[in-house]
Amino acid sequence: MTTVTSAWQQAAFDLPTIDASATVQFNGFNASLGKLIGVTVKFIMDETLTDTIYNFNTHAVTVGNPRPVFATSTITATGPLGLSTVNQLTTTPQFAGVVPAAPSLGSFGSKSISNTVTGIQSGPVTVNGTPASLAAYIGGQNSVTINVDGEGSQSGSLPPNVMNGYSASANGMVYLQYIYQVPEPASMALFALGLLALTQLRRRKSS
C-alpha cells in the first residue's frame, strides 16, 4: 500500500470579539480514493487587543500621569485534537497624553491604543486510526470549532469623568488534510491479472 497525503483544505474565521467561538466546514474524505488512516488539523490566527479611553468631560483632559494607560489580556484559543495557543497582549505604546473633549453633554471623546500579534499557530496535530475509528471524517461535511477566551485588565492614571475599557478580536485560518492508503501499482496489476485468470477459469469450466 502507498500512503498519500491530500492537499490542505482551508477555511477562514473572524471573531469581532473574544469569549466566542467560530465553526468552519470542510469536505469529508472521499472513500473512493482509498483507505483513510489519519486526519491532520492546524490553525493560524491574528489577535488584536484595543484599549479605549473615554472622556465624558466637555473639555480635553490629560491622562497617564504619573502612570501611563494600557490594557493587557491573556487570550487562549483551542480547537480539536488538543490544539491550543495561549498569548499575552499588551496595548503599545502605553499612552500618556490628551484625550479629546466630549462634543456635548451625554457623549464622550475617545482615544484608542491597539496591539496586534499575527501568525499565532497551533499544530499541526494528527489523529491516526482506521476507517472505522475515523468514520466521522468520511463523506459529507466536517465541522471544526475554534474557541477563543480572554482575561485581562486595565491600568493607568485617569482624571475624574474618564474611564477606559478594553476589547479584543481574532481572525485566522483553519487547515485540514487527510492521510490515506491506496494500493501500489504492482499490487493493482497483480489483482487485475488474478481477476482475468479467474474469469478465464470460469469460462473453461462452463464450456
What are the residue ranges of the model-derived segments?
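N-terminal segment immediately downstream of the Sec signal-peptide cleavage site
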Residues: M1-A60, A168-V174, Y178-Q181
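Solvent-exposed loop and beta-edge segments used for protein-protein assembly and interaction
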Residues: T5, A31-I37, V63-V69, S107-I113, ...
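Beta-strand-rich interaction/scaffold domains
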Residues: G64-P124
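A short, hydrophobic C-terminal helix/tail in secreted or cell-surface proteins
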Residues: E184-L201
